[in-house]
Each structure stands twice: as C-alpha cells, then as structure tokens.
Amino acid sequence: MAFSITGKTAIVTGAANGIGLAVARTFADRGANVMCADMDEKRLAEELGDVADEGNIRYFAGDLRQRLTIANLVSATIDAFDEIDILVNASRQVMETDALNPEDTSVEQLLEQNLMTALRLSQQVARRMIKQSDGREGDGPAGSIINLSSIAAHQTRPELLGYSIASAGLEQMTRSMALALAPHRIRVNAVAFGSVMSASLKSSIGDHPEWREEIETRTPMHRIASPTELVDAVQFLASEGSGFVTGDVMTVDGGRSLLDPVSAPAH
C-alpha cells in the first residue's frame, strides 16, 4: 500500500509522552521498527518498558542537545534495526517569554531544544540515509524526515515569542534541508499543528478548563483533534504515498489558523 510503513525503521524523538509517544506507538502498531528517544528515561521505561528490547520497538534515553548523544542514538538504531528510513523530530518544549526582560533566556533555550536539536539529528540521520542508498539499485526513496512545528510560527503572541521564533525557524530549516537533500532522494517536510490534544495542551486545559470552550469555539471544525489524527498526517509524509512531496509544511489545526480575530471588514 502506498501509505504503508511496514518494515521501515523510524526514529521518533520526544517519545516519552504526548504527540511523540502517539507517533511511536502508532508506527510500531502499523508495522514499523521504532526507536523511541527522549531525555526522560523514567517515563520511557514506564510507557515502553514492557515492550522494549523485543519485537519492533526500542527506546533510547539521552539529552539530544548534546552532539555525542545524537551520534549514540543513530548508532543504537543501526545496531537494533540495521537501517534508518524515517526520522520524526517530535521533541519540543513550550515556554513563555517575557518580551521586555533582557535577562530572559527562553528564546535561546527554545532555539536549542526545538530547532537546533532537530537540525543536528536530521544532519546525522541524513548522512546515514545517503550511505545506505549508495548500495541500492534504482532511484527509489532514500528516506523521509518529518519535523513537528506549530501554527505559532505564523501567529503573533508576545508571551510565546521564543516558541514562535523556534517554530518559524524549524519551518525554514525544513525548506532549506528539503532542497539540500532532494538530490539524495531524501524528503523533508513538516506538520504544523494546533488544536490537537497534545500533552502540553492537556495540561493547560487542566489548569484553565475554560480554554477548551474557547479553543473549540474559535476552531472552524469546533473540536480539538486527537493525537491519532496528527499521527496520520505524519505517516502520510513518511510513506511512499507522498513520494513527490518535499519542503512542505502541512497544517493540521481544524482551520484555526485561517481565522481573522477581527470580525469587522478590513476595508
């Protein structure tokens, strides 16, 4: 099937909870070999301990902001499954920024966590994908990289200054890497999401129950999506069904980013 990922090997970061965990579990259920990476070893063990180290799923704990940890993750994946076909950069952090405080370090932290980690891992994995494809015949796909972004990349909320900058940077990285890797038959795409019940959104709604109604009211489809709906978009971009798609940022937000907050006409 064009959308099948059976037999493919994927690295999924941010796999200890939320969207990353949903991607990892669903990919494994649909026949992919999955290396689940996260710095939260305790949570990885709690979520995956019963199935890891057997069958088609493994987990790797480490701080991917460190270059050596990235190299070790790639090596561990090759040791376990021989090849790498798919990378899903789902590791992300949401942090508020004080736009008027020059001592605030959230922008630097979020650029390092949400952008630079994804870039460095993509570079390492792409090198492995290129090496693998050198020994193959034909002009089939060499690999697919999917970055998880946010509609915050195109919205202006001062309290999310750092997160928005990092998300916008991730999308530009996606486009630039898509051009750099296209000659090697590696596709690079992103999914920008909003109005999806991620771990961070669930936590926020728990603290502010009134936000659920506000989100649903201001989302044209009048609901919050399940993580599975986002996973399906990621699988599409990982599969051969999207074989001619690269450099794209797919928006999965129920139409939320299409709305103008001002109802009065502009002219």
Which sequence ranges carry the predicted segments?
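Substrate-binding pocket helix/loop in short-chain dehydrogenase/reductase
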Residues: 98-111, 215
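Conserved glycine-rich Rossmann-like NAD(P)H-binding loop of the short-chain dehydrogenase/reductase
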Residues: 30-46
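Conserved NAD(P)H cofactor-binding loop of Rossmann-fold oxidoreductase domains
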Residues: 90-96, 255
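Active-site helix of classical SDR
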Residues: 122, 166, 174
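Residue(s) in the substrate-gating loop at a strand-loop-helix junction
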Residues: 150
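Short C-terminal tail/terminal secondary-structure segment
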Residues: 235, 246-267
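Alpha-helical segment proximal to the catalytic Tyr-Lys
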Residues: 127, 179-183, 243
